[in-house]
Curated annotation (Swiss-Prot):
(2S)-2-hydroxy-3-oxobutyl phosphate binds at residues 86-87, 128. Belongs to the DMRL synthase family. The gene is ribH. Coiled coil: none annotated. Catalyzes the formation of 6,7-dimethyl-8-ribityllumazine by condensation of 5-amino-6-(D-ribitylamino)uracil with 3,4-dihydroxy-2-butanone 4-phosphate. This is the penultimate step in the biosynthesis of riboflavin. Signal peptide: none annotated. It catalyses: (2S)-2-hydroxy-3-oxobutyl phosphate + 5-amino-6-(D-ribitylamino)uracil = 6,7-dimethyl-8-(1-D-ribityl)lumazine + phosphate + 2 H2O + H(+). It comes from the Bacteria. The keyword Transferase applies. NCBIfam families: lumazine-synth. This is 6,7-dimethyl-8-ribityllumazine synthase. Keywords: Riboflavin biosynthesis, Transferase.
């Protein structure tokens, strides 16, 4: 299990009141991405954030929509699921999405929670999606990371 050593930061209920967060979620492997989005939305709303879900076709479409969302949202959560196949396409997609999301966050100074799963098997994805049989909840974790980072940046700006 890869959850060993996970962060312990939590967000107090209601502490993100007034924060606008977009969830950009791909439709490939929808059984996984729907669960990721549900878990992320629940975490955001519990924290008090105003959450908007924006669907995209696949993982490669996530970065451009995330970049646009940084213009109107305080934080963005990127969710998707890329599962290893028999070609190098997996590596290209995973690298492009990860690089794109990191670059967007740094350039725009807008938090981007990365909940794009990159798994070898469907079973690994299920185990990370936050459903009833999952050992991890990457959708909620990405939301918590985005909200916490937004709160941190806001407090740094106030200093």
């Amino acid at each position: 299990m890869s959850g060993e050593g996970s962060p312990t930061i939590t967000i107090e209920p209601g502490s993100a009141h007034g924060l606008r967060v977009a969830i950009v979620v791909s439709e490939w492997n929808r059984d996984i991405t729907d669960e990721l989005a549900s878990q992320a939305q629940q975490a955001g709303e519990t924290a008090g954030a105003e959450v908007t879900v924006i669907p995209v076709v696949g993982a490669l479409e996530i970065p451009v929509v995330v970049k646009k969302a940084t213009q109107t949202y305080d934080a963005v959560v990127a969710l998707g699921c890329v599962i290893q196949g028999g070609t190098p396409h997996f590596d290209h997609v995973c690298n492009a999405v990860t690089y794109g999301l990191t670059k967007i966050a740094v350039e725009t100074e807008t938090p981007v929670g990365n909940g794009v799963l990159t798994c070898n098997t469907h079973e690994q994805a299920v185990d990370r999606a936050g459903g009833p049989t999952a050992h991890e909840n990457k959708g909620a974790e990405a939301m918590i990371a985005a909200i916490h980072t937004a709160q941190t940046l806001k407090s740094m700006a106030a200093d």
